[in-house]
Amino acid sequence: SAAVAAMTTIITIIMQMGILQLGLETIDACSKDQLTAILEELAYGNEYGDVLRAKGMLPSEKEGEWYYFDMVPEQYEIRTGAPDYTGKVCVIGANLKEDELKKAFGRN
């Protein structure tokens, strides 16, 4: 069917582009300034690779407050939310620099 052919084409393009997903868990607290700097680089730079999407939740420096974030190229949002058990980050892109991303999000 046309839908299957289109999906096969999309999957082929993604594989050729080397799109990867990196998932991290962390308990390290993060300041809003630190998170903003990371998201600025993810959204506008290439220090971490060619990032297409990032989202996650991290504990802030304030007890009981967490930052939730979403990022696409040239745009990101940070908001506060309810605490969770552990911080989680998901980054999708090509040529991802895993070690640099782990370092940025406190997973050395």
Where are these regions (language model features)?
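C-terminal accessory "lid"/substrate-recognition subdomains
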Residues: 1-83, 94-108
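Conserved nucleotide- and phosphate/pyrophosphate-binding catalytic cores
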Residues: 87
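Flexible loop/N-cap segments at domain edges
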Residues: 91
